[in-house]
Amino acid sequence: MINRDNKKAITKKGMISNRLNKFSIRKYTVGTASILVGTTLIFGLGNQEAKAAENTSTENAKQDDATTSDNKEVVSETENNSTTENDSTNPIKKETNTDSQPEAKEESTTSSTQQQQNNVTATTETKPQNIEKENVKPSTDKTATEDTSVILEEKKAPNYTNNDVTTKPSTSEIQTKPTTPQESTNIENSQPQPTPSKVDNQVTDATNPKEPVNVSKEELKNNPEKLKELVRNDNNTDRSTKPVATAPTSVAPKRLNAKMRFAVAQPAAVASNNVNDLITVTKQTIKVGDGKDNVAAAHDGKDIEYDTEFTIDNKVKKGDTMTINYDKNVIPSDLTDKNDPIDITDPSGEVIAKGTFDKATKQITYTFTDYVDKYEDIKARLTLYSYIDKQAVPNETSLNLTFATAGKETSQNVSVDYQDPMVHGDSNIQSIFTKLDENKQTIEQQIYVNPLKKTATNTKVDIAGSQVDDYGNIKLGNGSTIIDQNTEIKVYKVNPNQQLPQSNRIYDFSQYEDVTSQFDNKKSFSNNVATLDFGDINSAYIIKVVSKYTPTSDGELDIAQGTSMRTTDKYGYYNYAGYSNFIVTSNDTGGGDGTVKPEEKLYKIGDYVWEDVDKDGVQGTDSKEKPMANVLVTLTYPDGTTKSVRTDANGHYEFGGLKDGETYTVKFETPAGYLPTKVNGTTDGEKDSNGSSITVKINGKDDMSLDTGFYKEPKYNLGDYVWEDTNKDGIQDANEPGIKDVKVTLKDSTGKVIGTTTTDASGKYKFTDLDNGNYTVEFETPAGYTPTVKNTTAEDKDSNGLTTTGVIKDADNMTLDSGFYKTPKYSLGDYVWYDSNKDGKQDSTEKGIKDVKVTLLNEKGEVIGTTKTDENGKYRFDNLDSGKYKVIFEKPAGLTQTVTNTTEDDKDADGGEVDVTITDHDDFILDNGYFEEDTSDSDSDSDSDSDSDSDSDSDSDSDSDSDSDSDSDSDSDSDSDSDSDSDSDSDSDSDSDSDSDSDSDSDSDSDSDSDSDSDSDSDSDSDSDSDSDSDSDSDSDSDSDSDSDSDSDSDSDSDSDSDSDSDSDSDSDSDSDSDSDSDSDAGKHTPVKPMSTTKDHHNKAKALPETGSENNGSNNATLFGGLFAALGSLLLFGRRKKQNK
């Protein structure tokens, strides 16, 4: 809680501004363990109490016994800042009332180790700040002195092992010099530290029990002073008889250091295994201060509270670890280096896990003790307090703070707010305590002088080893420090271009100008006050003061230190502005007379779990009743946290460390295969069963009567019969046999397989030891069988199918049957034949083809069989199920596939690949036929109507000079179109009457049987080589009758040299009789081209060219042949004429 009290007083020197900030640290001692509060472990909801294990080894060797003092130490640093303005009583040039300048916001600065914490990271977004801004409030309205304190209450954990107080007088506190004490038990101090082995040994020694002091409780109650004396003697004996880390010269509070020793005492032999994945976070929250505005007033001691609730999986074992992460912008303590985390304990004080803190990563690593091996279903809650890290966040800004438990994060947006300087006139100053070192017994204070960089005259700064009052005078009491020539005072000048961090804390002074030496002659000491004369200034300065303090006689802290700045205004009046910071500690005790608070008595509950064979709910009524071991029993605390144990071999359980007046719940887990017995079967509370859940309130005594009983749940059978239903009617007939080795699977109501079995030789099966409930039975179809019809008759005689549901209700169920019948097999095949007439039909005269390969594929395309046709062309595949298949015929070499699907299925050809479906019958109609390809040989000598267009280039040397008077009657009936290109140089005057009678009788008989389109091209290939050299000079008048019978198949080679003078009358009668018989039989769709028979009888079929480019050779040959024939005729005619003549 922050308390601030602003005061206003009028003095003869003027108004004095004074501000107070309090820094609070609360510490407790429990047993031998001391806990610096900052991190509060709460094993339970709403209980902000840090628990320390009793009889722990966290004190070093000189502090190994439990003391009875329940010291709750509050350490508070307070800054008293007041501003007072008065008329001076000294002579003044002129008496005036000056207007007061605005005063800085009045929130006090509280930086504390109020509570120990652990760290996590968050992002920082710093906004630029200018500390020179004068954010002040009118001091004339009110002047307040704010007393800020933070008090967090914690209770010690109970000490079960020793209810008697064992103490010894302590004399070392009296012998110790109070001005220079050093903490002998601080493992973190700067003195040489013992090796880890020594520390472990010391901690081990600290756990050894001591001889008890024979002092009764009654004597201690009646004589509190006796108790104090025992405590002192006990402490003194420890120091004189036990080995210690350092010389026992200090009475500084040990409780601030105990937390570190928790970490040191970790057993090194336990293997570490991170089990964050086995930690389930159920709730996380981040709260700033009172949680109303999410403003972190860092100088006012506003803490950041992180609450986390989580469960620990039962798989976690001793030595396993989990992590807690702070935000990177916070620290567990901003005044001390005490960052060691508190142990995780349950409400009874048992330690669940011990923690170590990594300052670099701001992460706590907790290592679990054997608590997790002893208990189950553990629920825990942890509350961690932290403060803004002024090094990470030097100026006001907005942050998103992120904390995490076991890697599961939660975030909160916060605004960081720092104090403004106290201002009056040109006086402006602010200060905070920045570091407490209990080992060296020093306190560090940082002071900002003139942070607003005003032009200040006659500036003096006082540093007092106590608080100052409203007049700037020393105020004795309420804490002090030692300010003398041994006090470290450093002065640094801030350059004009440098801005001071609003956090009021400097971590690196090297960036500022060290002007300490300039004050060697401007620094004076008097009555525990140091005065520094700055004179006239317009720059800001930083003063770092490290002063000594003296703990109280009982080792507590009572520290105060004040500072003030005074200047004169233009009228010569003084203006004061100041701060006072203080830390105080106090003991919280059980009573006002200083006596130790009596230890709280704790209680236990428990008893017995048994098997109630006769189910009457009363223990001992049946000789067969026996205790039940390993039954899980869960205790729920009032705050909702839980822990669980299991009954031992004798059926007993127990929970201890319970508080009087509180209500607890005990729950028993029903063991598998059992049911809870009757509740309250008798009025004897020691013999009855209290049921599965019991609520009990502690009424000043133990309660060991919380019992419960269970009895075994009855078991039942399920099953019956699997048979061969030969008549396929779905009814179990007397003559139908059972089927053995049928697999049967049993599933529970969730579908989980709980058993499998197979039928015996009689087809019977049975599942045993079943509870009431719904079950599913699945039958696997045996190989070679098909499920029969189901649900055709009464339940005990029908077939329930492949899957059925069975219900057990307080009786066996032996009616779940299933029937199958043998699955019939089928055949497939038929015939492959030689289709000689190529009609695709199986004729009686056509024979089968032997050794044709046939392949059978199933529906998946897998080959399931191959065979070859026999000598009759037959093939067959047997033992086939109904289904889809594919038959593939491999075409025999040299044969051609015949036409398909030309007639009925049993007589046609089905082709090379056939798809077939068998449905409860054989299929013998899958046939295929092949034939052998024929070659066509055609002799054709024909003179047919031909339309020939030929280009003939004939080079003929003909020198003819003829005078021919020819009268020729030419009657030519010719179907021949001949285009002859002849280059002849002839001088012929011929009048020719040619009577030519040409009969072309062509008889062509072509018998063609083909299933194809036939293109017939008349291609004449004629080789004619004619070289004619004719030199003719004739003058003839001839009348000749020429009867010429020529065959158009001629190959003539004519070499003629003639010199004639003729007059001829040529009568040519040409009969061409050609009889061509062509018989072509083709079995494929192949164009068959008629061939022209030539002299060489190549008889080659040649396709017509697509472009006509190949016509030249043929046409030329024809042309030349015709020319040679004509030439031959002329020669022949010439000879005849001569003969006639």
UniProtKB/Swiss-Prot annotation:
<keyword id="KW-0134">Cell wall</keyword>
<comment type="similarity">
    <text>Belongs to the serine-aspartate repeat-containing protein (SDr) family.</text>
</comment>
<feature type="signal peptide">
    <location>
        <begin position="1"/>
        <end position="52"/>
    </location>
</feature>
<keyword id="KW-0572">Peptidoglycan-anchor</keyword>
<dbReference type="InterPro" id="IPR013783">
    <property type="entry name" value="Ig-like_fold"/>
</dbReference>
<keyword id="KW-0964">Secreted</keyword>
<feature type="region of interest" description="Disordered">
    <location>
        <begin position="54"/>
        <end position="248"/>
    </location>
</feature>
<dbReference type="Pfam" id="PF00746">
    <property type="entry name" value="Gram_pos_anchor"/>
</dbReference>
<feature type="domain" description="CNA-B 2">
    <location>
        <begin position="715"/>
        <end position="824"/>
    </location>
</feature>
<dbReference type="Pfam" id="PF04650">
    <property type="entry name" value="YSIRK_signal"/>
</dbReference>
<keyword id="KW-0677">Repeat</keyword>
<dbReference type="Pfam" id="PF17961">
    <property type="entry name" value="Big_8"/>
</dbReference>
<feature type="compositionally biased region" description="Acidic residues">
    <location>
        <begin position="930"/>
        <end position="1080"/>
    </location>
</feature>
<feature type="compositionally biased region" description="Low complexity">
    <location>
        <begin position="77"/>
        <end position="90"/>
    </location>
</feature>
<feature type="compositionally biased region" description="Polar residues">
    <location>
        <begin position="159"/>
        <end position="207"/>
    </location>
</feature>
<feature type="region of interest" description="Ligand binding A region">
    <location>
        <begin position="53"/>
        <end position="601"/>
    </location>
</feature>
<keyword id="KW-0732">Signal</keyword>
<feature type="compositionally biased region" description="Basic and acidic residues">
    <location>
        <begin position="61"/>
        <end position="75"/>
    </location>
</feature>
<dbReference type="InterPro" id="IPR005877">
    <property type="entry name" value="YSIRK_signal_dom"/>
</dbReference>
<comment type="function">
    <text>Cell surface-associated calcium-binding protein which plays an important role in adhesion and pathogenesis. Contributes to the resistance to killing by innate immune components in blood and thus attenuates bacterial clearance by interacting with host complement factor H/CFAH and modulating its activity. Inhibits also bacterial opsonization and killing by interacting with host complement regulator C4BPA and thus inhibiting classical complement pathway activation.</text>
</comment>
<dbReference type="InterPro" id="IPR041171">
    <property type="entry name" value="SDR_Ig"/>
</dbReference>
<feature type="short sequence motif" description="YSIRK-G/S signaling motif">
    <location>
        <begin position="23"/>
        <end position="34"/>
    </location>
</feature>
<feature type="domain" description="CNA-B 3">
    <location>
        <begin position="825"/>
        <end position="935"/>
    </location>
</feature>
<comment type="subunit">
    <text>Interacts with host complement factor H/CFAH (via C-terminus). Interacts with host complement regulator C4BPA.</text>
</comment>
<feature type="compositionally biased region" description="Basic and acidic residues">
    <location>
        <begin position="92"/>
        <end position="108"/>
    </location>
</feature>
<dbReference type="InterPro" id="IPR019931">
    <property type="entry name" value="LPXTG_anchor"/>
</dbReference>
<feature type="compositionally biased region" description="Basic and acidic residues">
    <location>
        <begin position="216"/>
        <end position="241"/>
    </location>
</feature>
<dbReference type="GO" id="GO:0005576">
    <property type="term" value="C:extracellular region"/>
</dbReference>
<dbReference type="InterPro" id="IPR050972">
    <property type="entry name" value="SDr-like"/>
</dbReference>
<dbReference type="GO" id="GO:0007155">
    <property type="term" value="P:cell adhesion"/>
</dbReference>
<dbReference type="InterPro" id="IPR011266">
    <property type="entry name" value="Adhesin_Fg-bd_dom_2"/>
</dbReference>
<feature type="region of interest" description="Disordered">
    <location>
        <begin position="929"/>
        <end position="1117"/>
    </location>
</feature>
<feature type="compositionally biased region" description="Basic and acidic residues">
    <location>
        <begin position="130"/>
        <end position="145"/>
    </location>
</feature>
<feature type="short sequence motif" description="LPXTG sorting signal">
    <location>
        <begin position="1104"/>
        <end position="1108"/>
    </location>
</feature>
<dbReference type="InterPro" id="IPR033764">
    <property type="entry name" value="Sdr_B"/>
</dbReference>
<dbReference type="InterPro" id="IPR011252">
    <property type="entry name" value="Fibrogen-bd_dom1"/>
</dbReference>
<feature type="domain" description="CNA-B 1">
    <location>
        <begin position="602"/>
        <end position="714"/>
    </location>
</feature>
<feature type="propeptide" description="Removed by sortase">
    <location>
        <begin position="1108"/>
        <end position="1141"/>
    </location>
</feature>
<feature type="modified residue" description="Pentaglycyl murein peptidoglycan amidated threonine">
    <location>
        <position position="1107"/>
    </location>
</feature>
<dbReference type="Pfam" id="PF17210">
    <property type="entry name" value="SdrD_B"/>
</dbReference>
<keyword id="KW-0106">Calcium</keyword>
<feature type="compositionally biased region" description="Low complexity">
    <location>
        <begin position="109"/>
        <end position="126"/>
    </location>
</feature>
